[in-house]
């Protein structure tokens, strides 16, 4: 049976960790599906990892649809989540809903992911009301890399931390069914996870999120040019064993440890957040 948004809400209620992996092809999707990974994210990171681009901004809808279709063929039980690429939803309402629907109709994805908070809340509401599950993404949002000034930790001070909390509440209220938190301080992610009713999925945001996500190539150590603080290599000899180790460490709370997390907020700042 295909995993569902309802099953992820139940996991949050039972304090059971959700496992997510970013992957881009049929073969890796089959491995992840066989390892009982909850969610396979077809991330726009494929622009850099698969297509050799400098960032995620140039990947197109048609390219994302092709890779999502391949993953959907390989995943029989895992929930397939597709990244909506840059400017596929930030423009008109019509573009947002038509592009989201293409992932469902043409590539057989089960939901879509968008980056941003209050500024895209209306788009989240529109897409979710059409019957398409929407996952939001806050913190380090790669599609906004030019505004953020590079790939760096977000929410390190009181003002920016409160902004992320406000955005998290806004996307939940607009109908987002889940929230990815990327590269925010561990205590901020913990606070957001406790405030929200929807599950949080962390990447570089500590162990208190309701689940974790890593890129398939990164957790297996296949990308020698990239080793972020939040990445752990599990096994590059046998992908099945590597994915199973990742899954088990996420579920048991072993991963991520403090060495894979960022901690910039002191208790005095946390007490001022609401």
Curated annotation (Swiss-Prot):
Q: What is this protein called?
A: 3-methyl-2-oxobutanoate hydroxymethyltransferase
Give me the residues that bind 3-methyl-2-oxobutanoate, please.
44-45, 83, 113
Query: How the cofactor binds, per note?
Result: Binds 1 Mg(2+) ion per subunit.
Annotated SUPFAM superfamilies: Phosphoenolpyruvate/pyruvate domain
Compartment list: Cytoplasm
Residues annotated as catalytic: 182
> Which of this chain's residues are annotated to bind Mg(2+)?
44, 83, 115
Pathway assignment reads:
Cofactor biosynthesis; (R)-pantothenate biosynthesis; (R)-pantoate from 3-methyl-2-oxobutanoate: step 1/2
Name the chemical reaction catalysed here: 3-methyl-2-oxobutanoate + (6R)-5,10-methylene-5,6,7,8-tetrahydrofolate + H2O = 2-dehydropantoate + (6S)-5,6,7,8-tetrahydrofolate
| Quaternary structure annotation from Swiss-Prot or TrEMBL | Homodecamer; pentamer of dimers.
Highest taxon listed in the record's lineage: Bacteria
> Which keywords annotate this record?
Cytoplasm, Magnesium, Metal-binding, Pantothenate biosynthesis, Transferase
Q: Name the coenzymes or cofactors required.
A: Mg(2+)
This molecule's function is given as: Catalyzes the reversible reaction in which hydroxymethyl group from 5,10-methylenetetrahydrofolate is transferred onto alpha-ketoisovalerate to form ketopantoate.
One GO term in the molecular function aspect is: magnesium ion binding
Q: Which family does it belong to?
A: Belongs to the PanB family.
Q: What class of enzyme is it?
A: transferase
- GO biological process, any: pantothenate biosynthetic process
């Amino acid at each position: 049976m295909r995993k569902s948004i309802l099953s992820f809400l139940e996991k949050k209620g039972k304090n059971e960790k959700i496992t997510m992996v970013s992957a881009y092809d049929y073969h890796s999707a089959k491995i992840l599906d066989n390892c009982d990974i909850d969610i396979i994210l077809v991330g726009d990171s494929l622009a850099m990892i698969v297509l050799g681009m400098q960032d995620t901004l140039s990947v197109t809808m048609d390219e994302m649809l092709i890779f999502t279709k391949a993953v959907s063929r390989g995943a029989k039980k895992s929930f397939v989540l597709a990244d909506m690429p840059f400017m596929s939803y930030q423009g008109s309402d019509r573009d947002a809903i038509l592009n989201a629907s293409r992932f469902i109709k043409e590539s057989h994805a089960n939901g879509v992911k968008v980056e941003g908070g209050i500024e895209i809340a209306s788009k989240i509401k529109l897409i979710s009301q059409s019957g398409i599950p929407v996952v939001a993404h806050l913190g380090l949002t790669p599609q906004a890399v030019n505004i953020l000034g590079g790939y760096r930790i977000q929410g390190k001070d009181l003002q920016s931390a409160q902004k992320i909390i406000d955005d998290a509440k806004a996307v939940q209220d607009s109908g987002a069914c889940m929230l990815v938190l990327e590269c925010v301080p561990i205590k901020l992610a913990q606070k957001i996870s406790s405030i929200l009713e929807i599950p949080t999925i962390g990447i570089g945001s500590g162990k208190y999120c309701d689940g974790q996500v890593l890129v398939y190539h990164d957790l297996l150590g296949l990308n020698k040019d990239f080793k972020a603080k939040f990445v752990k290599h599990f096994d590059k000899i046998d992908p099945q064993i590597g994915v199973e180790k990742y899954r088990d460490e996420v579920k048991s709370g072993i991963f991520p440890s403090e060495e894979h997390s960022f901690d910039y907020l002191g208790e005095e700042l946390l007490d001022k957040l609401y």
